[in-house]
Amino acid sequence: MTSRKYFGTDGIRGRVGQFPITPEFMLKLGWAAGMAFRKMGACRILVGKDTRISGYMFESALEAGLSAAGADVLLLGPMPTPAIAYLTRTFHAEAGIVISASHNPHYDNGIKFFSGQGTKLPDEIEMMIEELLDAPMTVAESENLGKVSRINDAAGRYIEFCKSSVPTSTDFAGLKVVIDCAHGATYKVAPNVFRELGAQVVVLSAQPDGLNINKDCGSTHMEALQAAVLAEHADMGIGFDGDGDRVLMVDHTGTIVDGDELLYIIARDLHERGRLQGGVVGTLMSNLGLELALAEQGIPFVRANVGDRYVIAELLERNWQIGGENSGHIVCFQHATTGDAIIASLQVILALRRSGVSLAEARLKLRKCPQILINVRFAGSGVDPVSHPSVKEACARVTEQMAGRGRVLLRKSGTEPLVRVMVEGEDETQVRAYAEELAKLVTEVCA
């Protein structure tokens, strides 16, 4: 397949004001997308965004480009990414567009697409859009321009969808939960979902100002949530990222429960009830302890490349239902077509209530192996540190020294200029030493 010029592992992302995250490019992208989706005839496209300030600028640019191509546009306003996937399906739209940089700071932004089925856009459509981006822009005849309208009840529709993922008899009365919305796209919907199910809800970071999204809050900065759970004597805390497709949790002792542990809790509950279809999909970054714990339950486990689109592709290929990443992307295909943080957290709470144990007790059933991850800034000097001979030789040596009781993984981030150095094994001191050794070598090679 031809290599992509603009699309990365999860759409298009970068620094606001730097190509391609500019109004000019977004105008052209909207036009190219509209032209691609209109090849089958008239179409309408949903557009949603998170709460970062640049979203308004890019929403207007995309709207103009789509309309110029003759595509009708439905504006959703600030909504979680999985909500846009869901609403794209329910409105029978040809595609959905999300303006978001997920867990990144406010000065980044990006675009990702959903197909009309609420799934990640097929590669061939992405390539068609890329080709059109390099073609001259034309404008439809006046009578064929796309119409633009705003959907005012999007939040209510999505809240009801989330609630429909649990049995109608579900009552969270007696549950006290702290929710950190990261000043992001879940700030309106998440608290209402849990309140309407009967929980006592304490809300953090739900006052977006366009600049504070993900700033010292949410699933990438859990300290405030940990402190609030302890101060409020809550049963648990739930931390979302800026666009609502990642979730981490905090138990009543203030301990973080990561995506591997949440995935295990959901999968074990389904397995014990005879509801697990197939096995579980993790990633190259999933903790070895998850694989071992699932094996003890007789649950198959496979690893996909890092990125929720690869987890989803593996689930589709195997006709399995459950997968995710330790970062908190969790896919529950029996309920949603993509990673949905609110739905995943609801499934965890249901599993806990069925088993009668606390989140703290449930997480201890998964014995994680020490895993050290070091991010090394990579400026793109022309040298690929991951495939550099000295780095490959060092990785092979460390792997041999661990004698089958650990893993080494080096990979470039698909969304940031980073090389991720991960070492995993039984002895934390040894694992840390190996990781620091490899990170130092990668730094030297990058320099």
Swiss-Prot record:
Phosphoserine, modified sites: S102
One GO term (biological process): peptidoglycan biosynthetic process
E.C. designation(s): 5.4.2.10
PROSITE patterns: PGM_PMM
GO MF term set: magnesium ion binding; phosphoglucosamine mutase activity; phosphomannomutase activity
Post-translational modification: Activated by phosphorylation.
Magnesium is among the record's keywords: yes
Enzyme class: isomerase
Keywords (A to Z) from UniProt: Isomerase, Magnesium, Metal-binding, Phosphoprotein
Entry binding sites for Mg(2+): S102, D241, D243, D245
Co-factor note (free text): Binds 1 Mg(2+) ion per subunit.
Signal peptide: none
UniProt cross-references to InterPro entries, sorted A to Z: A-D-PHexomutase_a/b/a-I, A-D-PHexomutase_a/b/a-I/II/III, A-D-PHexomutase_a/b/a-II, A-D-PHexomutase_a/b/a-III, A-D-PHexomutase_C, A-D-PHexomutase_C_sf, A-D-PHexomutase_CS, Alpha-D-phosphohexomutase_SF
Cofactor(s) required, per the database record: Mg(2+)
Catalysed conversion reaction: alpha-D-glucosamine 1-phosphate = D-glucosamine 6-phosphate
One GO location term (cellular component): cytosol
Active site: S102
Coiled coil region boundaries: none
Homology family: Belongs to the phosphohexose mutase family.
Role: Catalyzes the conversion of glucosamine-6-phosphate to glucosamine-1-phosphate.
Name the record gives this protein: Phosphoglucosamine mutase
Organism expressing this protein natively: Pseudomonas syringae pv. syringae (strain B728a)
